[in-house]
Amino acid sequence: MSKQLCEKMSKIYLLITHIWAVTNLETLEAIKGVTRSNYGAPLLLVVGCRPAEAWVRRYDGKNGAEVDAAIVATYLMLAAENEGLATLWVGSFDPALLRDILPCTEGYDLVAMINVGYPAPESTPSAMHSERKAVEELVTRVV
């Protein structure tokens, strides 16, 4: 990831977002009980946010913490992919169990876990990653 991108992210999004980089084998093994989405990646990034510190839209009170954390997570994934690494966003996990394993996450809403590593040569994405709706079903042109 470029230094400029890191600096930009830290100024904009990392005010309320935190990233935990997990590489300890025992901890990675323990985290397997938190989700079914485990693929043996040597690095797991856990992304969390603090809604109490986030920007809130004044019109309806919409809190931007999760959106900001998702932006950070997306940038992390794009940067890793740019370095030739594979990533997998995991949203299906039990935050309470993860917090038991990583007490340092206390006080944060846990948004995502991201597996990072080199892809296995035989790996292929599931159908849900290649099947697409027609553009007309996704985009409405307003004229």
Language-model segments: which ranges?
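A glycine-rich helix N-cap at a beta->alpha junction
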Residues: R36-L45, P103-P125
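Acidic, metal-associated active-site segment
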Residues: V72-E81
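Glycine/small-residue-rich phosphate/adenosyl-binding loop
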Residues: S2-V72
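Short secondary-structure boundary segments
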Residues: C49, S92, Y118
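C-terminal helix-cap and adjacent tail motif
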Residues: Y59, A112-V143
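Short beta-strand segments at enzyme active-site cores
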Residues: T87-G91
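Glycine-rich phosphate- or other oxyanion-binding loops that anchor nucleotides, phosphorylated ligands
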Residues: L97
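Structured binding elements
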Residues: G84
